[in-house]
A protein has these predicted regions:
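Short, flexible helix/strand-to-coil boundary loops that buttress conserved ligand/catalytic motifs
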Residues: 70, 79-82
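Short S/T/G/P-rich N-terminal loop/turn motif that feeds into the first structured element of a domain
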Residues: 1-53, 61-71, 94-106
Length: 106
């Protein structure tokens, strides 16, 4: 399994309705891209100085599934929308469920 994480810091002048539309469009990707095993998206709740504004965590069966998602036309539309309203975007993709990973339960 591969876990894909993306975080967005929106431009200061971007209205809340536009931010909500971005998150809604991200969440809708799971219904139209079959390679998505699971997807969670939402807004930052702590609002600390170091915080980004929203984030996405998606899980894919393998690298081929993640690559198919990456080039899917619906994903590319949302990527363009997100870039247009963001001052910063960061992402990381890592293998999950095998190898040197840890799960911590409290």
């Amino acid at each position: 399994m591969l876990t894909h994480i993306v975080i967005w810091k929106y431009q200061a002048n971007v209205e809340q309705e536009v931010r909500e539309e971005h998150v809604r469009l991200l969440g809708a990707l799971a219904a139209v891209i079959s390679e998505v095993e699971s997807l969670a998206v939402g807004f930052d709740v702590l609002k600390l100085p170091r915080s980004f504004d929203s984030g996405l965590v998606a899980v894919f069966r393998d690298r081929a599934a993640l690559e198919a998602y990456t080039v899917h036309p619906e994903h590319l539309k949302v990527v363009a929308f997100g870039k247009a309203i963001s001052e910063q975007v960061a992402s990381v993709d890592f293998e999950s469920g095998a190898g040197p990973t840890a799960t911590v339960e409290s």
